[in-house]
């Protein structure tokens, strides 16, 4: 193999893309990963890091451009780590995400008879985020800065706009930056673990336009609190809720456990199709409401509900998918380990007048065995776990339950593939549909249908 050393300048043709969207050039089968390089491009690059099994390169010049390359519309794209694919046409982004799923399920796990559908995309893949979490800091000139982190760092890129956030959020961000500066509010400095203002979090109801503004502070005492609220109301008189969240943990966790309502309601309301949901500052709620409706509609299609089925909604959160399905089911049982989420789910059931739902707090693998002992046998099980996927004990419990169908929503297809191999003992993976919940990024969600053999 050719010698490869740091700072070498080389040329080559990009033959593949990684799941992170990096171009792959190979030298005698040794891969070099190059951010922002695209398949079939002939490029010049510099080796910046060499590892045992791969190297990292920096793109210097593109000698032959891909037909899928586009000019990134965001002026911060080269520095900000929030988006990874703005240089790739949206049609090619959707195809790339489908290829990721094919690679995981067919090429690696050999689910050769399982259908992989086209990625479900957006008509307008911008301004889709209904929740923004914006770090606050100071620059070398001691000026207040707000924006998003540089890739793989906690260096804040000072911004005035973000093209994937709700447009209202950037208006709030810019106004808050001015308010913090004018009122000389203490700013948290992560390295020193001192200062007050850590993050600004903004949530909006996609269909209702209700807005919640949350100030995350390092401690409860905040001398300028009332003045800040007054200025926010002057600028945004239609704001629904203003809250202070206290996070004095000095960790990377954005929000703490305690929140105080400074103005308005404790929650905001949003809708998904015909269902209404109450959302608190800490509720888990899908970021892209438009795509969530498409995701859930595909899940309902897979569930094949006729009105006679008992549905078990595991990892149910605030009850979104369970309540979405309730009008089409005989009864929905939801289980979630987070107590506040179950409280929200129960309230959301009341709001939607769903009398055929039961929500219980606990570990799914334990609660469903209790339900089984009570004679409750689900026809359909909904699974929507966190990125780490399902606990193996849960999978084994599910295998003993033997529902007719399992509909598995995943925000991490790699762990979904791992779990699919365990489910294969008794279940046939019929098909997988990728859904683009986060355009311009490498993230892809999937919904999969498993039928009992």
From Swiss-Prot:
The active site is at 411 (nucleophile). InterPro entries: MeTrfase_TrmA_AS, MeTrfase_TrmA_CS, NA-bd_OB-fold, SAM-dependent_MTases_sf, U5_MeTrfase_fam. It holds the Pfam family tRNA_U5-meth_tr. It is an enzyme of class 2 (transferase). The keyword Metal-binding applies. Keywords: 4Fe-4S, Iron, Iron-sulfur, Metal-binding, Methyltransferase, S-adenosyl-L-methionine, Transferase. [4Fe-4S] cluster binds at residues 74, 80, 83, 162. Gene3D superfamilies: 2.40.50.1070, Nucleic acid-binding proteins (2.40.50.140), Vaccinia Virus protein VP39 (3.40.50.150). Belongs to the class I-like SAM-binding methyltransferase superfamily. RNA M5U methyltransferase family. This is Uncharacterized RNA methyltransferase SACOL1957.
